[in-house]
């Protein structure tokens, strides 16, 4: 295929979102909304992508700053789509080939559709091809006017359309493929003599027709692909459609999702074969989950790397953690950022971890806080154990070596180190290092006063 560039229009504020955040930067299934059309034109073959920015341009520029195929064009005053494209003339100066043009609030268009669209444009040897669709209720959309041969002669906006033209149900999607040599000459000559007093990009069709050049329509069957997102209702609907696509792709690849409608998996998440995901699970942040895992209901997993044969029980929350193979987590466990669990570790109910390394085969089965700690292999952490890691100013680490047994209700006042094969008696508060092969016990001796209750009645 010939060389292709793309223009993504992203300068508008999006007032109907009722938000301080510019519309195209609203999150959608793990990415800002504008990332969806940008990624799609890239997959469709665009060698260079020009983003037209205006409102909160610094947020858009910052997000895409490290993506070398993206350049920016500023539209300080929003005077219409034609004006927005004209702002790209310098950024695309000297480019020859086809230019894809679409809006930054159209996240559902697919790479396959755009690739077919481009191929059609070249086959027809058109100067302009408009991607269109038919709608049962086309209110608010520009209508596509054609001649007897089926070529596009005009696109008329809703407010400028006659009663007869409003009966047409083939609408302009706002996605175009235009010959670069024609495009910037045509937009430079646009006028704003319309109801909106804007420079309509669609008016370049009149120029092409006057020059007896071919303008084509490329209709697609699914109107949802070209749905624009203008408010939070449409944002939620777009998220639902993307979620269906993500979950379907995972299921086709070998993941079992018990109830796809209540399973929320973001773009960029990888899940292995024969893993089962139960309802009301949320997985995000580029999480990678291995094969043969079980993710029970209401688990929340963000930015984690999970090995094979891992069970994450109901209600567990995990973020920025690394999990080995054959690990059991939860129910109701909380793995905070910096947690690393080696193979065959068990983290039970109401256990919280943060910035720890826990060696293979170690267990913390219930009601425990482990923070800023290095724990060896085959260590048993008893119920109610706490690493006291914060002195009010700084965080300190606890080190527990291999094969240590920690009884219930133990506090480690960091910094402290426990030697291998030691035993920490239940109820002990550890304030100094424990040598290897030792018993540490630090609690007041039990005193029984017989008959005490009778005397004090």
From Swiss-Prot:
Residues 1-232 are annotated as: Pyrophosphorylase. It catalyses: alpha-D-glucosamine 1-phosphate + acetyl-CoA = N-acetyl-alpha-D-glucosamine 1-phosphate + CoA + H(+); N-acetyl-alpha-D-glucosamine 1-phosphate + UTP + H(+) = UDP-N-acetyl-alpha-D-glucosamine + diphosphate. Acetyl-CoA binds at residues 389-390, 408, 426, 443. GO terms for molecular function: glucosamine-1-phosphate N-acetyltransferase activity; magnesium ion binding; UDP-N-acetylglucosamine diphosphorylase activity. Its main location: cytoplasm. Binds 1 Mg(2+) ion per subunit. Pathway: Nucleotide-sugar biosynthesis; UDP-N-acetyl-alpha-D-glucosamine biosynthesis; N-acetyl-alpha-D-glucosamine 1-phosphate from alpha-D-glucosamine 6-phosphate (route II): step 2/2; Nucleotide-sugar biosynthesis; UDP-N-acetyl-alpha-D-glucosamine biosynthesis; UDP-N-acetyl-alpha-D-glucosamine from N-acetyl-alpha-D-glucosamine 1-phosphate: step 1/1; Bacterial outer membrane biogenesis; LPS lipid A biosynthesis. GO terms for biological process: cell morphogenesis; cell wall organization; lipid A biosynthetic process; peptidoglycan biosynthetic process; regulation of cell shape; UDP-N-acetylglucosamine biosynthetic process. Coiled coil: none annotated. InterPro entries: Bifunctional_GlmU (IPR005882), GlmU-like (IPR050065), GlmU_C_LbH (IPR038009), Hexapep (IPR001451), MobA-like_NTP_Trfase (IPR025877), Nucleotide-diphossugar_trans (IPR029044), Trimer_LpxA-like_sf (IPR011004). Catalyzes the last two sequential reactions in the de novo biosynthetic pathway for UDP-N-acetylglucosamine (UDP-GlcNAc). The C-terminal domain catalyzes the transfer of acetyl group from acetyl coenzyme A to glucosamine-1-phosphate (GlcN-1-P) to produce N-acetylglucosamine-1-phosphate (GlcNAc-1-P), which is converted into UDP-GlcNAc by the transfer of uridine 5-monophosphate (from uridine 5-triphosphate), a reaction catalyzed by the N-terminal domain. PANTHER family: BIFUNCTIONAL PROTEIN GLMU, NUCLEOTIDYL TRANSFERASE. HAMAP family: GlmU. This is Bifunctional protein GlmU. The lineage of its organism: Bacteria, Pseudomonadati, Thermodesulfobacteriota, Desulfuromonadia, Geobacterales.
